[in-house]
Amino acid sequence: SAWTRIFGDNSFIEYAFQFARKYAPEGCKLYYNDFNEYMPQKTTAIYDMAMELKEKGLIDGIGMQGHYNVYGPSMEDVDAALTKYSTIVKHIHITELDIRANQEMGGQLNFSRDGGNISQVVKTLQEDQYARLFKVLRKHKDVVDNVTFWNLSDRDSWLGARNYPLPYDENYKPKRVYSIIKDFDPARDNAVVKEDFRPSVLNQPGQQYPMVNSQGYARFRVVAPDAKSVIVSLGLGGRGGTVLRKDKEGVWVGTTDGPMDEGFHYYHLTIDGGVFNDPGAKNYYGSCRWESGIEIPAHDEDFYAMKQVPHGNVQQVYFYSKSTDTHRRAFVYTPPTYGKDKKKYPVLYLQHGWGEDETAWSNQGHANLIMDNLIAEGKIEP
């Protein structure tokens, strides 16, 4: 800055605080406010300077501007900065918060104001970043006094509406992220996730991920070092799924925000806007396409478990359909005793659901295993 050139160093900052303390109204709190305040090296520099000012009675709080983007910073860095600052001051303000829809961040005055339509992928990334940030801020609620957004709507933002940075859109209507910020679930903030994860029973042979734990959380791992974003369609909170984060080795990992409903779930990956199946999971036909599948442990899973009992057969048959003028396929379950005598059995026809196909009842629904178990227990007559 010009002041640094005049003074030859940053000592002008202390003079500013001295004059402010001397001439400001009594009781006025003095804050040091800066951008990129989460970066470890800069966090240390701010900490060291604030420590000297605190020892001289010149500072009351620290302001973190909060000009972030959908890709960063990591909430681990923000959490570490808040933790470090809170050892010096008891008042921290988030002073200029916005999360833009590109890779730029910080308080620089040169930035991109133009852009196309905001994709649903980017909206999901922004919602996740806001949710993660406010979870960290709530963790430090004893020292974070307030959060100030850097204007009301995208129309008014210094970044421009195309950067989509604020909770209100350019027409002053609240985005979904507004509700995510406001209607958080305190129970999730304090939830303790058990680290008893094990591979899903529906994984490809030899694959460790995805994983599930005894509480119903799901954890995912995707190796895509050159990707900019990876989203799993399975998740909670109406945020479009679970956003994975890349570690230092270029591996994307993430855990669902909370326990999933028990039983079978379809899901897919969205990598940089493209839709893919998870290479670690088996595929199942649903939603009119082959999707990845995961099984969340259920309290009644014994009902459809593979047991050491006599098993029937599931046979594939083809037939000609006059109504559709096509050859069709069906699967027929026959009980373990079928064919051993001349006994005739009643027929029950099951139609698959919308978007699924004839494999669903046995693959996803385990109908054949349910029948095997009920017959073995004498609870049903084949």
Report each predicted region and the residues it spans.
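Extracellular ectodomain segments of secreted/surface proteins
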Residues: 189-221
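Aromatic-rich carbohydrate-binding modules that target alpha-glucans
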Residues: 211, 219-262, 272-296
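N-terminal cap/lid segment of alpha/beta-hydrolase-fold proteins
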Residues: 211-214, 218-221, 245-246, 287-341
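Aromatic- and acid-rich polysaccharide-binding/catalytic face
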Residues: 28, 32-34, 47-75, 79-111
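Short substrate-entry loop that stabilizes the transition state in hydrolases
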Residues: 338-382
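Aromatic-lined carbohydrate-recognition surfaces of secreted/lumenal glycan-active proteins
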Residues: 14-43, 93-96, 146-152
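Alpha-helical scaffolding within the catalytic cores
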Residues: 10-19, 36-52, 75-82, 132-133, ...
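Aromatic-rich peripheral "rim/lid" segments of glycoside hydrolase catalytic domains that contact
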Residues: 2-10, 19, 77-93, 97-188
